[in-house]
């Protein structure tokens, strides 16, 4: 059995702040700043240690790209919220289309 991240478990926090920072090419204090600004919310151990997931790392990479493009933290927060809302609405659209297709197939 392994304690490492499982490929399908991208929400599970497994990386400490130093490793996460190194993996995404940012400084650990930057990760703390982004958390304090509400840009991400890593898991915490019972002792309070931050644990970053694969999804957190992807989000940090997106934050870094937006910063490199000149977007400030307030703008990044707005962009990330809009992306999440877009993903939610897209998933809802797929679900509704599937339901509509199922309803059409079940008609006599």
Regions found by a protein language model. Name each.
Residues 1-65:
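Basic helix-turn-helix/winged-helix DNA-binding cores
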Residues 14-17, 24, 42, 80-82, ...:
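A general secondary-structure boundary signal
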Residues 1-7, 81-108:
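C-terminal regulatory/oligomerization modules of transcriptional regulators
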Residues 59-94:
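A short, Lys/Arg-enriched interface patch at domain edges and termini
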């Amino acid at each position: 059995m392994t304690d490492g991240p499982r490929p399908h478990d991208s929400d599970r926090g497994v990386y400490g702040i130093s490793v996460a920072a190194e993996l995404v090419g940012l400084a650990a204090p930057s990760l703390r700043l982004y958390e304090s600004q509400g840009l991400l919310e890593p898991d915490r151990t019972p002792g309070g240690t931050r644990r970053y997931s694969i999804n957190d790392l992807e989000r940090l990479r997106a934050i870094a790209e937006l910063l490199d493009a000149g977007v400030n933290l307030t703008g990044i927060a707005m962009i990330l919220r809009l992306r999440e809302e877009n993903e939610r609405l897209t998933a809802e659209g797929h679900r509704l289309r599937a339901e509509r297709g199922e309803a059409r197939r079940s008609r006599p």
